[in-house]
Amino acid sequence: MIIERLVGNLRDLNPLDFSVDYVDLEWFETRKKIARFKTRQGKDIAIRLKDAPKLGLSQGDILFKEEKEIIAVNILDSEVIHIQAKSVAEVAKICYEIGNRHAALYYGESQFEFKTPFEKPTLALLEKLGVQNRVLSSKLDSKERLTVSMPHSEPNFKVSLASDFKVVMK
C-alpha cells in the first residue's frame, strides 16, 4: 500500500467508531517523506508524501482511511530533556544554545517549558548554564516543534529548462 497524502487526524474523529491500526514511529522518523513501515497488525505500507507537512507527521495523523478502517501515526515515547526556563532572557539563551547545536526543540506543556531529544552534551551544557531540567520519557510530536528547517531537504517543485534555453561557449 502506497500512501501519498494525509487523510486527516484522529483528534478530529471519534476513534471508537473505527478499527484503528497504528504505525509506530520514532520522533526522528516523522520528517521522512519517503519510507517503508509495518503497522502493528503487520501491514506493509510505503509513504511517498507529495505535500508533506513542513513540521513532519504528527501524533494521530491518518495515513489511510477506508470505511471503518484507519491506519494512523503513533509517535513512540523517547528519552527527552525537559527544560524549564525562569525568564524570557533564559528562554532566549536556551533557544540560542539548542539552535546553535542544530538540535530539535519542542514546546513543553507550560509557557516556559521546552523539550529536546536527550543527548549527553546538551544535558551537560544545560547544567553548565544553570538551566533547570530533567530527563523524562515523552513524545516529541512534530506539531509542537519550534524549528521547521530541514537540512538536505529536497525542493517541493520541479525544475525544467525553457524551450529557448541555450548555452553559448565563447
Curated annotation (Swiss-Prot):
Its main location: cytoplasm. Keywords: Chaperone, Cytoplasm, Nickel. Pfam families: UreE_C, UreE_N. One of its GO terms (biological process) is urea metabolic process. One of its GO terms (cellular component) is cytoplasm. One of its GO terms (molecular function) is unfolded protein binding. InterPro entries: UreE, UreE_C_dom, UreE_N, UreE_N_sf. Transmembrane segments: none annotated. Belongs to the UreE family. Involved in urease metallocenter assembly. Binds nickel. Probably functions as a nickel donor during metallocenter assembly. This is Urease accessory protein UreE. It comes from Helicobacter pylori (strain G27). The lineage of its organism: Bacteria, Pseudomonadati, Campylobacterota, Epsilonproteobacteria, Campylobacterales.
